[in-house]
């Protein structure tokens, strides 16, 4: 008797490949009630690319404690918050800090995707991207779109 080899392009292989990545709509199901303004799918992709470029230049702050410390010191940049972080109390004070200091901020759907964009295997609930000459064009484009989003009431 011979073994029957599984077809590498069969339906099981395709199902496994698709199950690893969730769609934008699936990620929106787990959002916090405070996750406003929420980035669109297109803006989310632009932010991920900008974050990846910022990581290469070491122009990034990640984590609540580090971001809060540097915002208090007066550092400028775009704050990107994950909309699926629980409990909300972990980072609910950060949007207020941003509004007091006129810093742009935006929520994206997934903390795991945010951590992956920052080059980490761990989920990250907040990242601050600082401007730099190497990726200034991408940064300015993201900044303009984030500032055009309506702030919550």
From Swiss-Prot:
InterPro entries: eL8/uL1-like (IPR050257), H/ACA_rnp_Nhp2-like (IPR002415), Ribosomal_eL30-like_sf (IPR029064), Ribosomal_eL8/eL30/eS12/Gad45 (IPR004038), Ribosomal_eL8/Nhp2 (IPR018492). The modification Phosphoserine is found at residue 19. There is a cross-link at residue 5 (Glycyl lysine isopeptide (Lys-Gly) (interchain with G-Cter in SUMO)). It is found in: Nucleus, Nucleolus; Nucleus, Cajal body. One of its GO terms (molecular function) is telomerase RNA binding. One of its GO terms (biological process) is telomere maintenance via telomerase. There is a cross-link at residue 5 (Glycyl lysine isopeptide (Lys-Gly) (interchain with G-Cter in SUMO1)). One of its GO terms (cellular component) is sno(s)RNA-containing ribonucleoprotein complex. Keywords: Isopeptide bond, Nucleus, Phosphoprotein, Ribonucleoprotein, Ribosome biogenesis, RNA-binding, rRNA processing, Ubl conjugation. There is a cross-link at residues 3, 5 (Glycyl lysine isopeptide (Lys-Gly) (interchain with G-Cter in SUMO2)). SUPFAM superfamilies: L30e-like (SSF55315). Part of the H/ACA small nucleolar ribonucleoprotein (H/ACA snoRNP) complex, which contains NHP2/NOLA2, GAR1/NOLA1, NOP10/NOLA3, and DKC1/NOLA4, which is presumed to be the catalytic subunit. The complex contains a stable core formed by binding of one or two NOP10-DKC1 heterodimers to NHP2; GAR1 subsequently binds to this core via DKC1. The complex binds a box H/ACA small nucleolar RNA (snoRNA), which may target the specific site of modification within the RNA substrate. During assembly, the complex contains NAF1 instead of GAR1/NOLA1. PANTHER family: RIBOSOMAL PROTEIN L7AE FAMILY MEMBER. Belongs to the eukaryotic ribosomal protein eL8 family. Required for ribosome biogenesis and telomere maintenance. Part of the H/ACA small nucleolar ribonucleoprotein (H/ACA snoRNP) complex, which catalyzes pseudouridylation of rRNA. This involves the isomerization of uridine such that the ribose is subsequently attached to C5, instead of the normal N1. Each rRNA can contain up to 100 pseudouridine ('psi') residues, which may serve to stabilize the conformation of rRNAs. May also be required for correct processing or intranuclear trafficking of TERC, the RNA component of the telomerase reverse transcriptase (TERT) holoenzyme. This is H/ACA ribonucleoprotein complex subunit 2. It comes from Pongo abelii (Sumatran orangutan).
């Amino acid at each position: 008797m011979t073994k029957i080899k599984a077809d590498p392009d069969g339906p099981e292989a395709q199902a496994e490949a698709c199950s690893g990545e969730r769609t934008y709509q699936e990620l929106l199901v787990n959002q916090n009630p405070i996750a406003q303004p929420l980035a669109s799918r297109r803006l989310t992709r632009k932010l991920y690319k900008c974050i990846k470029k910022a990581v290469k230049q070491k122009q990034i702050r990640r984590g609540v404690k580090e971001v809060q410390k540097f915002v208090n010191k007066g550092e400028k940049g775009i704050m990107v918050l994950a909309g699926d972080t629980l409990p909300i109390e972990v980072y609910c004070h950060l949007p207020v800090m941003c509004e007091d200091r006129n810093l742009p901020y935006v929520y994206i759907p997934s903390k795991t995707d945010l951590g992956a964009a920052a080059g980490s295997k761990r989920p990250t609930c907040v990242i601050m991207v600082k401007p730099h000459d190497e990726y200034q064009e991408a940064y300015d484009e993201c900044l303009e779109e984030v500032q055009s989003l309506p702030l919550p009431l």
